[in-house]
Amino acid sequence: MSRRGALLRCLFLAAIAAATSAAEENNPVTRAGPPRGTLLIVGGGAMGGLWDVFLRLAGGKESEIVVIPTAATTVDGEDAVLGVLRTRGAVRVTQLHTRDRSAADSEAFCAPLRSAKAVWITGGRQWRLTDAYLGTRVQRELEALLARGGVIGGSSAGATIQGSYLVRGSPRDNRIMMSPGHEEGFGFLRASAIDQHVDTRGRADDLRPVLRAHPALLGVGLDEATAIIVRGDEAEVVGKGQVRFFPAPEAAVHVLRAGERFDLGARRLSTASR
């Protein structure tokens, strides 16, 4: 190869490397967490300072926030969460609710999501969320919100729905861990099953049967008043209690407290925690 040809080849390879680096920067590759955006996944119970964490992640009190209360048994007027957020200084809070899938698929209904910086999904029963929104424009707009760097938070049912496998999805009884027809979550945290209220309801090992049936899943069990902040493949624990990470059906559980971090992709303590 001539010197000129070699130079051109080097320039060509450098251009490919630069383009690849730029593409990875714009579309980072992750194995579990969202490539863009942030998740706040709360184990239920009293929120306390976790509301301030949510508002900080959302970009402050002026950010547009949408509250989705559909997991509740009934939604009569504004959900109490809107008042809580306003009391803490949020000034642009909107409620979004329907049980009509055709409405959930409409552009007009989803309009608030397109300008929102953050979304909060309240507690209740997670099957109501999938019946209303799974596979609709609402779910696609939530994914788009994350893709533009937004924040999705939720507690209890609003936590479990963020996993890919929906535990306790049975409309009959929330003690049923696997319910055919209600086993798919929104999948913001991929290849995962998320449980909540672990400490107060004696659920420390309830995820084991799910993981034996679906061994590719990462199990995440959250105490009340406790959360993980997920950015990319890293989860940081915040709050009062513990978070249990089950990397495999029979593997030892990793129990983390506030300030500790877990690598969701590698399924081990992150280097920051070690």
What are these regions (language model features)?
Residues 24-61, 72-79, 84-87, 92, ...:
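C-terminal and late-domain segments of enzyme folds
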Residues 126-136:
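Glycine/threonine-rich flexible loop motifs
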Residues 112-115, 135-149:
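Catalytic-core regions built around general acid/base machinery
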Residues 2-10:
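Twin-arginine (Tat) signal peptide motif
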Residues 66, 72-115, 121, 128:
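Portal/gating segments that form or line small-molecule/metal binding sites
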Residues 120-123, 142-166:
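Catalytic nucleophile loop
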Residues 9-18:
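Bacterial N-terminal signal peptides
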